[in-house]
Amino acid sequence: MPNSTAQYPEKDSWEFLVKSGIAGGTAGCVAKSVVAPLDRVKILYQTNHASYRGYAYSRHGLYKAIKHIYHVYGLHGLYQGHTATLYRVFPYAGIKFVAYEQVRRVLIRDPEHETHARRFLSGSLAGTCSVFFTYPLELIRVRLAYITNTGKNPTLTQVTKDIFHERDFLCNKKYPGLSRLSKICNFYRGFSVTLTGIFPYAGMSFLAYDLATDFFHKQKIDEWVSTKKSDKKLKTWPELLCGAFAGVCGQTVSYPFEVCRRKMQIGGIRKNKSFLRLKQVVQTTYKEAGMRGFFVGLTIGYIKVIPMVSTSFFVYNHSKALLGID
């Protein structure tokens, strides 16, 4: 691969936007596919599903939960809702990486502006942008993963219809003209808390990845972690380690928000198809399990996030190289 940056397209060109979007979308899909079974179990834990409540705090609960799902529903059960995940992840990851590259280009125009705050803000704004455009698909994915006892596998079409016809957060009697709009808002259950959580998660993930990369590029370390082809490119293992560090940092700071978000997303199933407010979710969670209720499934989160984020950054960087962008 040529080392001259002059041969790469400019970051504000359409070619770079399209190719970075493809690279980001591909990275997201590969990463999510790697950890799909863990994601299914984590959602069941976070939403306090009655059939899996006993596994959540047990020593070997993760293994037992996966074994139970496989025994009852087969391999497909571990990937239930994964199609909806891929529909969401490709545009989500694509938009996130494109937005990050563009926001970073604006906020960090030269090395003097490359501060921790600007790096964090670049990641946070990128995550916010991607969530806004893809949240309805995320809600559908969570519903598909949560449903377990219908006797047949729920379909994407059926779940979408169910969400649309659920009781909306506006009273139709008071606001009859907003009925259709409020139905669309059904697909944004938990959106406010999602934004609250994605801001620190995305910001910390990108910041931690940059800091880890900077660490490996220090002179005494760079000699044995960089490839021979390019001083800028890390070997596989340090590159994966940077992604793992980024994932752990992002997951830690945002996990309580994620637990609340999941419970708000499935509120239409559990609470007479009504909207759950953040205050209700926080009070109920604390009453049922105390502070540890906000961190239920965090172990799975760590187990999941290390391979997922590592794979995501790794595939993104190598996809960019294959597509001829930097």
From Swiss-Prot:
<feature type="repeat" description="Solcar 3">
    <location>
        <begin position="234"/>
        <end position="322"/>
    </location>
</feature>
<feature type="transmembrane region" description="Helical; Name=2">
    <location>
        <begin position="83"/>
        <end position="103"/>
    </location>
</feature>
<keyword id="KW-0677">Repeat</keyword>
<keyword id="KW-0812">Transmembrane</keyword>
<feature type="repeat" description="Solcar 1">
    <location>
        <begin position="15"/>
        <end position="106"/>
    </location>
</feature>
<feature type="transmembrane region" description="Helical; Name=6">
    <location>
        <begin position="294"/>
        <end position="314"/>
    </location>
</feature>
<feature type="transmembrane region" description="Helical; Name=3">
    <location>
        <begin position="120"/>
        <end position="140"/>
    </location>
</feature>
<keyword id="KW-0472">Membrane</keyword>
<feature type="repeat" description="Solcar 2">
    <location>
        <begin position="114"/>
        <end position="215"/>
    </location>
</feature>
<feature type="transmembrane region" description="Helical; Name=5">
    <location>
        <begin position="240"/>
        <end position="260"/>
    </location>
</feature>
<keyword id="KW-1133">Transmembrane helix</keyword>
<dbReference type="InterPro" id="IPR002167">
    <property type="entry name" value="GDC-like"/>
</dbReference>
<keyword id="KW-0496">Mitochondrion</keyword>
<feature type="transmembrane region" description="Helical; Name=4">
    <location>
        <begin position="191"/>
        <end position="211"/>
    </location>
</feature>
<dbReference type="GO" id="GO:1990559">
    <property type="term" value="P:mitochondrial coenzyme A transmembrane transport"/>
</dbReference>
<dbReference type="InterPro" id="IPR002067">
    <property type="entry name" value="Mit_carrier"/>
</dbReference>
<dbReference type="InterPro" id="IPR018108">
    <property type="entry name" value="Mitochondrial_sb/sol_carrier"/>
</dbReference>
<feature type="transmembrane region" description="Helical; Name=1">
    <location>
        <begin position="16"/>
        <end position="36"/>
    </location>
</feature>
<dbReference type="Pfam" id="PF00153">
    <property type="entry name" value="Mito_carr"/>
</dbReference>
<keyword id="KW-0813">Transport</keyword>
<dbReference type="GO" id="GO:0015228">
    <property type="term" value="F:coenzyme A transmembrane transporter activity"/>
</dbReference>
<dbReference type="InterPro" id="IPR023395">
    <property type="entry name" value="Mt_carrier_dom_sf"/>
</dbReference>
<dbReference type="GO" id="GO:0005743">
    <property type="term" value="C:mitochondrial inner membrane"/>
</dbReference>
<comment type="similarity">
    <text>Belongs to the mitochondrial carrier (TC 2.A.29) family.</text>
</comment>
<protein>
    <recommendedName>
        <fullName>Uncharacterized mitochondrial carrier C17H9.08</fullName>
    </recommendedName>
</protein>
<keyword id="KW-0999">Mitochondrion inner membrane</keyword>
